[in-house]
Design a protein with these regions (language model features):
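Per-ARNT-Sim (PAS) sensory domains and their PAS-associated C-terminal
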Residues: 70-88, 94-100
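PAS/PAS-like sensory domain cap-loop motif
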Residues: 33-44
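Terminal output helix/cap of sensory domains in signal transduction proteins
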Residues: 48, 52-79
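Sensory modules in modular signal-transduction proteins
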Residues: 1-33
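Hydrophobic beta-strand positions
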Residues: 17-18, 78, 93-94, 106
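Cysteine-centered metal-binding/redox modules
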Residues: 23, 87-90, 103-104
């Protein structure tokens, strides 16, 4: 799937991927790495998504993993106090060599709102 990650790397939206069964982080694109202050991929590889993205010690109560299905998106919104931003979240599941992978695209609603005000 390394070619797939190249597609997401330079998106303005934050994108992350994690193993649905183990919660292990697999990928954060450049926007997500900057948002969470990671200089390189080694800083998050193998860590749990809930530890890094929410600073929790166990899976998040609002985790959508159980709602995810291949070829469908689940959309929801959430404020993340770690980065002090509101996001529209688009989650899906892909299966790669039998491994269930969650991909989340986070659209920063605060930036969108600022842009609307600037260009109105």
């Amino acid at each position: 799937m390394s070619k797939v990650w190249e597609f997401f790397e330079n998106m303005n939206e934050a994108v992350y991927a994690s193993d649905v069964d183990t919660y292990e982080l697999i990928y954060l694109n450049k926007t997500a790495r900057n948002l969470f202050h990671f200089k390189d991929k080694a800083a998050y590889k193998g860590k749990k998504c809930y530890e890094i993205l929410q600073q929790c010690s166990s899976p998040c109560a609002m985790c959508t993993n159980k709602r995810l299905k291949p070829d469908e998106f689940y959309e929801w919104s959430r404020f993340n106090p770690l980065v002090n931003r509101s996001f529209l979240l688009k989650d899906t599941m892909v299966i790669d060599d039998g491994r269930r992978i969650r991909i989340e695209i986070a659209i920063d609603l605060d930036i969108r709102e600022m842009a609307k005000k600037t260009f109105s």
